Amino acid sequence: MEPIIEIENFSAYYGEKIAVKNVTMKIFKNQITAIIGPSGCGKTTLLRSINRMNDHLPGFRVEGKIYFKGQDIYDPQLDVTEYRKRVGMVFQKPTPFPMSIYDNVAFGPRIHGVKSKHILDRIVEESLKKAALWDEVKSELNKSGTRLSGGQQQRLCIARALAVEPEVILLDEPTSALDPIATQRIEKLLEELSENYTIVIVTHNIGQAIRIADYIAFMYRGELIEYGPTREIVERPKNRLTEEYLTGKIG
């Protein structure tokens, strides 16, 4: 199987505090990889590091390498804006912009130079369809994105990420603020999207990871304890810490 992201001996620091310790793992194309572990284990820091979202935090620094399709993403020559177009991010709390549904989705393409109304119309429709939201909002595209329900807002954020045609979508606890029905819809959507996109999701919800992930990475106190196919991790964990986390003995 082809890796699209390769993480090699990667560590991340906030000042003197180490948040991610010497992580090495490969993320495979068109698979769903779930990163699990207790609060403060470094999973969100690792996810944000893949998107270079921590760059401007005071005292943040990294060691080691993260490669996207063979390119070092921390290379000073890297065009970070262009890179983030290829590796999109969806956050824990739905973050629709205070503008219309249409403008939320068209925002990224416009930044990247798309001016044609005809092309923008097509991108908006296609992205909302991919995010399983089109049928619910197609007659009210001028409505503010902030007036949608929580689950709809999160799907709008996914549509916004899809609009710039990424190859990878990173999601940080995307369903933690949603009710069970909205959560189920997002999970189904991610499974569908993985046919064409690589998905990396951070989740506290072990059941969610088991339901949707092809691979699970378990982190504890900044370290990657175990990583492998979901069934293998769940049924035959090699590390005692993994087993204790999965059975609720540590958390």
From Swiss-Prot:
Pfam families linked to this entry: ABC_tran (PF00005)
Leading EC class: translocase
Residues binding ATP, per UniProt: G37, P38, S39, G40, C41, G42, K43, T44
GO molecular function: ATP binding; ATP hydrolysis activity; ATPase-coupled phosphate ion transmembrane transporter activity
Keyword check for Protein biosynthesis: no
Membrane-topology annotation of the record: Peripheral membrane protein
Family indicated by similarity: Belongs to the ABC transporter superfamily. Phosphate importer (TC 3.A.1.7) family.
Name of the featured protein: Phosphate import ATP-binding protein PstB
Native source species: Thermotoga maritima (strain ATCC 43589 / DSM 3109 / JCM 10099 / NBRC 100826 / MSB8)
Native organism taxonomy: Bacteria, Thermotogati, Thermotogota, Thermotogae, Thermotogales
